[in-house]
Amino acid sequence: MVNLNQSLGDLFKGIIPNVYVLGATIVSFLILFLFITYFVYRPLKKYIKKRKDFLQNHIDLTIKSNVEAEKLEKKSQQKLLETKEFCIELKEKSQIEANEFLEDAKKTAIDNARQLINEGQKVLLEYENEIKSKYYMNVINVAVEICQKYLEKQDKNNKILQQSLIADLEKELKKRENSSKKKDNFGK
């Protein structure tokens, strides 16, 4: 039995560690664990949290910026549509006003021509016996030329007025398009 106890003791003698070595190993493990925890794990955990918060803030800001950009784009599209409608309406009104002005000018020219013709006829009636054959055609020709010149002048003035109105309208459209483009570029 002593042999058996001794052989078992020899067997377990190599398996059971030395208490001092085991204590030193546990203490060194605890020191290493505390060192890694305080000097590596916690700073690394704080850095990862800061980095995660930083990225999340940027993601949130990007989403918010995209939403605001979409809102601004919708507003600018709405304003562009309103501007186009306004320009179409303004163009139609200017064309109507120009046509009315042209008609009024024609009526005035015709009235003036009629008045000139009537005056010419009165003069012709007074001097009918003396200059009937000689000046009858001259008075009518003068009246027609005056009417033509007056109509040409009125037509030219109307064209100039219409061109200036259209040019002003185009400038206004370009200004509004440029301002909307600038807003679009700024929003992007």
From Swiss-Prot:
The chain crosses the membrane at residues 19-39. GO terms for molecular function: proton-transporting ATP synthase activity, rotational mechanism; proton-transporting ATPase activity, rotational mechanism. It is a single-pass membrane protein. It is found in: Cell membrane. The keyword Membrane applies. Keywords: ATP synthesis, Cell membrane, CF(0), Hydrogen ion transport, Ion transport, Membrane, Transmembrane, Transmembrane helix, Transport. F-type ATPases have 2 components, F(1) - the catalytic core - and F(0) - the membrane proton channel. F(1) has five subunits: alpha(3), beta(3), gamma(1), delta(1), epsilon(1). F(0) has three main subunits: a(1), b(2) and c(10-14). The alpha and beta chains form an alternating ring which encloses part of the gamma chain. F(1) is attached to F(0) by a central stalk formed by the gamma and epsilon chains, while a peripheral stalk is formed by the delta and b chains. F(1)F(0) ATP synthase produces ATP from ADP in the presence of a proton or sodium gradient. F-type ATPases consist of two structural domains, F(1) containing the extramembraneous catalytic core and F(0) containing the membrane proton channel, linked together by a central stalk and a peripheral stalk. During catalysis, ATP synthesis in the catalytic domain of F(1) is coupled via a rotary mechanism of the central stalk subunits to proton translocation. This is ATP synthase subunit b. It comes from Mesomycoplasma hyopneumoniae (strain J / ATCC 25934 / NCTC 10110).
